[in-house]
Swiss-Prot record:
Taxonomy, superkingdom: Eukaryota
CC per GO annotation: nucleus
Main location: nucleus
Cellular compartment(s): Nucleus
Protein name per Swiss-Prot or TrEMBL: Homeobox protein HD-11
Positions of transmembrane segments: none
UniProt-listed PROSITE patterns: HOMEOBOX_1, HOMEOBOX_2
Record feature DNA-binding region, as residue ranges: 30-89
InterPro entries: HD (IPR001356), Homeobox_CS (IPR017970), Homeodomain-like_sf (IPR009057)
Gene Ontology MF terms in the entry: DNA binding; DNA-binding transcription factor activity, RNA polymerase II-specific
Keyword entries, A-Z: DNA-binding, Homeobox, Nucleus
Protein source organism: Encephalitozoon cuniculi (strain GB-M1) (Microsporidian parasite)
Length: 138
């Protein structure tokens, strides 16, 4: 079990490494037009936001490759979400945000990111929403 998980992790890291070496192909992303995020992408971003309000640059790049969203878009999503919490002025949200602002960027390990994406993919699929994801990603 451990060796299989280690092998899967190495394969995942190798695949992400190759994608990073090749660089982001801008034609993969729709340029000049605003794109709505799919339900899967939004669920994954919300789950990451629960873990860290300030993900590191490495985490953002890894996440961008895993959910097929441009890193700048992910960065702006986190900024907008933090701002929305501040604007609402909810006591709980403001306290959580104030606590996290004291910390610097958090690096979330790749296996955890991959697990979160897989869990959210299963959840979206379980509720019959995978059709929405497939249509939106085309």
């Amino acid at each position: 079990m451990t060796s299989e998980r280690t092998k899967n992790l190495r394969e995942l890291e190798a695949a992400l490494g190759l994608l990073k070496l090749s660089g982001f192909q801008m034609n993969r992303y729709c340029t000049g037009k605003q794109m709505r995020k799919t339900r899967l992408q939004t669920c994954v971003l919300n789950r990451i936001f629960e873990i860290s309000r300030f993900p590191s640059s490495k985490t953002i790049v890894d996440l961008a490759l895993l959910i097929n969203v441009h890193p700048k878009s992910i960065q702006k999503w986190f900024q907008n979400t933090r701002q929305a919490i501040r604007k609402k002025g909810s006591t709980k949200g403001a306290l959580l945000l104030a606590e996290s602002e004291e910390h610097s960027a958090v690096d979330i390990p790749l296996p955890i990111l991959a697990d979160i994406v897989e869990i959210e993919r299963r959840t979206v699929s379980k509720f019959g929403l995978e059709r929405v994801f497939l249509q939106d990603s085309n």
